[in-house]
C-alpha cells in the first residue's frame, strides 16, 4: 500500500504501448483466446501473445484500493478488439480472477482526438479535468492539457511507473 500520496480522482490510460506492448489494431489478429498457461495472456490467430506490461495489474489494483476512478482513452482503429481483449484477459482484481475490463469505469475507444474521449469521461463522471491524470505513449495526445488534465508521456518501454510519478507530482 502506498502512503503519503494524494491520489487524483481519475487516472486515464491509453492502451497501445501504455498498458500492453502492441497496437491492437495492427500487431495482432482476431480471434483471441486465453492462454492455457496464464489467464492474463491472450493468444491471437497466429500465436502472438497479448498481455499487460508486468507492473500494470499491481498498479491498477493499488489505484482501485485508493478509490481512484480508472478509465481508458484509446484512439485505436479496432475498438471492438480492444474491448474484446480487455474482456477475455483475466487478472487478479480484489483477490479473484476477473476480466481486466472490470478495472475501468469508462472505456472510450475509437479513432479520433483524445479531447473527445476526455469530454465524454468528464460529462459522464462529473470529475473535473484538473482531477484527471492521463498516461499515454504519444506526445501528440498532450493536447488534453488544454482541458486541465495532467498528462504524462510514458517513455520507458516496459514500465508505466505511475506510483513514482504520483509520489513526485501529487501533494501528500
Curated annotation (Swiss-Prot):
Binding site for Mg(2+): 14, 16, 137
UniProt keyword annotations, A-Z: Cytoplasm, Hydrolase, Magnesium, Metal-binding, Nucleus
Predominant place of localization: cytoplasm
GO cellular component: cytosol; nucleus
Domain of life: Eukaryota
Record's keyword annotation contains Nucleus: yes
The EC number(s) this enzyme carries: 3.1.-.-
Alphabetized SUPFAM superfamilies for the sequence: HAD-like (SSF56784)
Active site: 14 (nucleophile), 16 (proton donor)
UniProt-annotated location(s): Cytoplasm; Nucleus
UniProt cross-references to InterPro entries, sorted A to Z: HAD-like_sf, HAD_sf, HAD_SF_ppase_IIIC, MDP-1_euk, MDP_1_eu_arc
UniProt GO molecular function: acid phosphatase activity; metal ion binding; protein tyrosine phosphatase activity
Keyword Metal-binding belongs to the record: yes
Family membership noted in the UniProt record: Belongs to the HAD-like hydrolase superfamily.
Protein name: HAD-like hydrolase superfamily protein P8B7.31
Source organism: Schizosaccharomyces pombe (strain 972 / ATCC 24843)
Amino acid at each position: 500500500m502506498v502512503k503519503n500520496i494524494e491520489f487524483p480522482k481519475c487516472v486515464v490510460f491509453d492502451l497501445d504501448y501504455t498498458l500492453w506492448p502492441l497496437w491492437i489494431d495492427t500487431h495482432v489478429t482476431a480471434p483471441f483466446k486465453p492462454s492455457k498457461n496464464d489467464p492474463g495472456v491472450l493468444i491471437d490467430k497466429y500465436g502472438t501473445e497479448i498481455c499487460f506490461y508486468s507492473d500494470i495489474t499491481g498498479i491498477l489494483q493499488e489505484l482501485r484500493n485508493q478509490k481512484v476512478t480508472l478509465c481508458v482513452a484509446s484512439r485505436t482503429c479496432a475498438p471492438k478488439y480492444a474491448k474484446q481483449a480487455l474482456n477475455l484477459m483475466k487478472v487478479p482484481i480484489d483477490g479473484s480472477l476477473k476480466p481486466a475490463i472490470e478495472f475501468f469505469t469508462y472505456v472510450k475507444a475509437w479513432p479520433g482526438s483524445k479531447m473527445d474521449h476526455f469530454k465524454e469521461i468528464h460529462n459522464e463522471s462529473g470529475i473535473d479535468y484538473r482531477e484527471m491524470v492521463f498516461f499515454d505513449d504519444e506526445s501528440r495526445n498532450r493536447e488534453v492539457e488544454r482541458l486541465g488534465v495532467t498528462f504524462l508521456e510514458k517513455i520507458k518501454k516496459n514500465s508505466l511507473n505511475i506510483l513514482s510519478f504520483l509520489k513526485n507530482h501529487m501533494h501528500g
